[in-house]
From Swiss-Prot:
Highest taxon in the source lineage: Bacteria
Species the sequence originates in: Acidithiobacillus ferrooxidans (strain ATCC 53993 / BNL-5-31) (Leptospirillum ferrooxidans (ATCC 53993))
Subunit composition and interactions: Forms a complex with DabB.
Gene Ontology CC: plasma membrane
MF terms in GO: zinc ion binding
Main location: membrane
Protein name: Probable inorganic carbon transporter subunit DabA
Binding residues for Zn(2+): 334, 336, 521, 536
Length: 825
């Protein structure tokens, strides 16, 4: 290989490296598997330009296969009117007739991914060299990043990733086993610095300068799962003001593999094939969006949904300016689309109740430390840093008793870990099964029949039922209360400020009911590595229980209420907040800490429980349509949904956020009584009460962005499951402890959602449409926020979501280019 002295424009290469790294979306670990926009690194490009970029790099863009759209036209989901509007939207000169004619013609040239050198080797002998390279890198990454799953850990994990790989390659004999010679020697000749190695690799491969960006992006996407994990490590470091070079090092490893294969390849034909591939890329033309048939059809699909949504909103009741009487109760749920159904059901069984929608962390920006643990869990949107750390504590216990119970849990967890290590160790493989196998027969039978849970719920491991019932968040601060290793709780002087933030942004500043429920949400499943993806995204992939309980504790705190009153927020003395958890698998709501309620509210609580039970039944019956039990009696539907929480063979315990398509920030009266089919994120917001529009700014910079991430995660998992989804859930194997899953026993780390989360085996349940954001607020204020926040501006201006304004009179306007807001008819 050439020496560093021959490298020119090193700073330019460094910029190329950074650009490629920024294109990769982070992949959160299984312990808090939050949805993320897989195209987040392309948001600086207009949506259909990003489609062109992806078709050039991966061979697959942002649309479904043609037959999908043909089916939507055939069943009436896409109408003639939708097609006509889509042609105008895409500035196409075609008529609908010409479009339909073009649909019959398949593209003459298939979209070919941007090549890596292993592709040239594959083209020569048809052996899966790209898969071999990915397999070797994936095995290395699994060992390097392992979080305790491996019995024997890699000896070089303390070294930077690239330097550790150089040592690993000295011992890796797998290339020789498949007929590759000189690999170890070529790896040993690589420079020690990752950036220098990348520059040398590009020289070795003769990648033209104008293709460097594309090549580096393609190289990272070829190992995109582990690239996502490395990007996550970098994301976490950046939140702390630090840096992490794992992604850069992974890029170096990937391009160095290509350079090594090129250097050791003696076949002139393969090298010629490689240069021909690069030349083809330099002269490649991609269809314009206006001539891209599937882009027009995708736009028509989205227009069809918008037409239905806007019609529903226009027909809904308009918000009233009259003073609302005191509700019989108030219930705040997360904005999650699954809450839309149960809110609508609760309002049906109890017309006098008021429901609200707010992000499920309920405004408490914290990390939460489970009882007996030293490892905090984030309970806030992942785009924020937690200012507070709150510990789970044993109620009504002395310090000595608390320490005894904590030590007992830690001991149980250590014993369980040791026992599992013994059961899975090489020495006990046969003796353990022969000696104790029959003792597991009753549990195996019960688990197989779905009568028992295969394992305890993660939050209950090491706890007996009595201790579990006594656990609750500890509000009292130690230290300064800020998020650090030694300080916990929320200082009394800051509680009123936190309380004001909660109530103001929830839109709950007057007309308080006697009983106010804050209901977080979570899912209950077994044998589901990606189970936290069903929990609350606003709580960083945890259930909303802790967030709801700490918010309730704070708002019931006398000191907090005194401080709130000084700020002009007077909560009536007979108003009490209570925490709950909506199980989205069964639609049952558990209420916590009821012993703290005064006896004067016993009837209120009993009535609320009954309403929640009735609403849960209505919700289950509605969801049964998509679960195949719609024809069954209510009690049968309930039993089936409870079974899903225990059945280790159930690949579709619930549909989670499949179908999500809209985000609505408006007074509830705007959507009350409207069947939004569980497809809309609902955030209560009344701009008339938002002095300074700080709440509007929060909505557009946090919940709206998170909803876009969720929406695009589903979108990417559906339109390109191979790269941005996780394949077949049945084949998932956990790697690295809790890092992620492989499909089968090898290949790249998988990202996104499994096919079973999108398809019921016969038809697609999710519909890939970009998020439709509808906000009831002045256009000028929204424009001001868009101009101040580049992230929001990129999402709106580049078409990664649709933004609509709904006026006081119910008129709807769509934000288009040049800051124009044409009225929707």
């Amino acid at each position: 290989m050439q020496t560093p002295a021959t490298i020119k424009s090193y700073q330019d290469i460094k910029a190329n490296i950074e650009k490629a790294c920024q294109r990769i979306a982070p992949l959160w670990p299984l312990k808090h598997f939050v949805a993320v926009n897989p195209y987040v690194g392309l948001r600086d490009q207009p949506f259909w330009r990003a489609d062109q970029t992806l078709r050039k790099i991966t061979g697959k863009g942002l649309t479904m296969p043609r037959p999908y759209y043909e089916e939507q036209i055939a069943n009436g989901r896409i109408t003639q009117e939708d097609l006509d509007e889509a042609l105008k939207e895409m500035h196409s000169n075609w008529s609908v007739t010409q479009l339909k004619q073009a649909m019959k013609q398949r593209s003459a040239s298939r979209n070919v991914p941007f090549p890596v050198f292993a592709d040239a080797m594959f083209a020569d002998d048809r052996r899966d060299w790209p898969g071999f390279v990915v397999e070797r890198i994936s095995q290395y990454c699994a060992a390097y990043f392992d979080e305790g799953q491996a019995t024997w850990s890699m000896p070089w994990r303390d070294d930077p990733m690239y330097q550790a790989w150089l040592k690993f390659m000295h011992f890796d004999k797998s290339p020789r086993m498949v007929g590759l010679r000189g690999i170890g020697e070529a790896a040993a000749a690589l420079p020690a610095a990752a950036e220098t190695a990348i520059a040398l690799a590009l020289k070795e491969l003769s990648v033209p300068f104008d293709l460097i960006d594309d090549y580096l992006f393609a190289a990272l996407l070829s190992i995109g799962g582990w690239a996502g994990w490395a990007r996550y490590l970098r994301w976490q470091a950046e939140l702390k003001g630090e840096t992490d070079q794992s992604l850069r090092d992974l890029l170096a490893i990937r391009v160095c593999w290509d350079a090594i294969l090129h250097k050791t390849c003696a076949d002139i034909a393969v090298r010629k094939q490689w240069h021909l591939m690069l030349h083809t890329q330099q002269n490649r033309a991609i269809e314009k969006p206006s001539e891209h048939v599937d882009a027009i059809l995708q736009t028509a699909l989205e227009i069809g949904y918008q037409r239905s949504l806007i019609k529903s909103l226009k027909e809904a009741s308009r918000p009233s300016n009259t003073v609302i009487e005191r509700p019989v109760a108030q219930a705040a749920f997360c904005i999650d689309v699954r809450s839309e159904i149960i809110r609508r059901a609760l309002e049906t069984v109890a017309p006098g109740i008021q429901t609200l929608g707010f992000a499920g962390f309920f405004g408490v920006l914290m990390e939460y430390v489970p009882f007996g643990s030293n490892a905090p869990k984030g309970h806030l949107p992942v785009i924020f840093n937690p200012p507070y750390r709150v510990c789970e504590d044993l109620s009504h216990a002395s310090e000595d008793e608390t320490q005894r119970h904590a030590a007992k849990r830690q001991l149980r967890l250590r014993v369980a870990t040791a026992w599992k290590s013994f059961k899975t160790s090489a020495v006990s493989t046969f003796t353990f099964v022969e000696a104790t196998g029959l003792l597991y027969a009753p549990k195996l039978f019960g688990d197989s029949m779905g009568w028992t849970r295969t394992v305890p719920h993660p939050d209950e491991r090491g706890l007996d039922s009595g201790t579990k019932q006594r656990l609750r968040p500890r509000l009292i601060a130690s230290g300064n209360g800020k998020s650090s290793a030694k300080s916990t709780g929320i200082p009394e002087t800051e509680r009123a400020g936190v309380g004001e933030f909660i109530l103001k942004n929830m839109g709950l500043t007057q007309t308080f009911a006697r009983l106010i429920l804050l209901a977080g949400h979570g899912s209950t499943t077994v044998n589901n590595p990606q189970g936290t993806g069903l929990d609350c995204g606003a709580c960083a992939g945890q259930t909303g229980e802790a967030s709801a309980r700490i918010a309730v504790t704070l708002l019931n705190d006398p000191a907090t209420r005194r401080g709130l009153e000084e700020k002009g927020l007077k909560i009536p003395k007979d108003t009490y907040f209570i925490a709950g958890l909506h199980d989205t698998t069964t639609d049952e709501v558990t209420i916590f800490d009821t012993e703290d309620l005064p006896t004067t509210h016993a009837k209120d609580l009993a009535q609320l429980r009954q309403w929640l039970a009735d609403a849960g039944e209505l919700t289950r019956l509605e969801r049964a349509t998509l679960l195949g039990t719609a024809s069954q009696a209510p009690e049968v539907v309930t039993r089936d949904m409870r079974r899903r929480t225990r059945d280790w063979a159930e690949v579709r315990p619930e549909w989670a956020l499949a179908g999500n398509a809209a985000f609505i920030a408006a007074p509830r009266q705007r959507t009350r009584g409207v069947d939004l089919e569980g497809r809309a994120f609902l955030h209560d917001y009344d701009w008339h009460k938002d002095a300074g529009f700080s709440t509007l700014e929060l909505i557009m910079t946090a919940p709206m962005v998170v909803a876009n991430w969720i929406n695009m995660q589903y979108y990417g998992s559906m339109v390109d499951n191979l790269r941005f989804g996780s394949g077949n859930k049945v084949l998932h194997n956990v790697v690295g402890g809790s890092i992620g899953v492989l499909e089968g026993n090898g290949g790249d780390l998988r990202v996104g959602f499994a096919l079973q989360s999108l398809h019921d085996g016969k038809r697609w349940i999710h519909e890939p449409v970009r998020l439709n954001v509808v906000i009831e607020a002045p256009q000028a204020e929204m424009e001001s926020i868009i101009s101040r926040h580049i992230l929001v501006r990129e999402l709106v201006d580049n078409g990664w979501l649709y933004l609509f304004q709904i006026d006081d009179d119910g008129s709807v306007y769509r934000r288009v280019c040049d800051k124009q807001w044409p009225r929707m008819t």
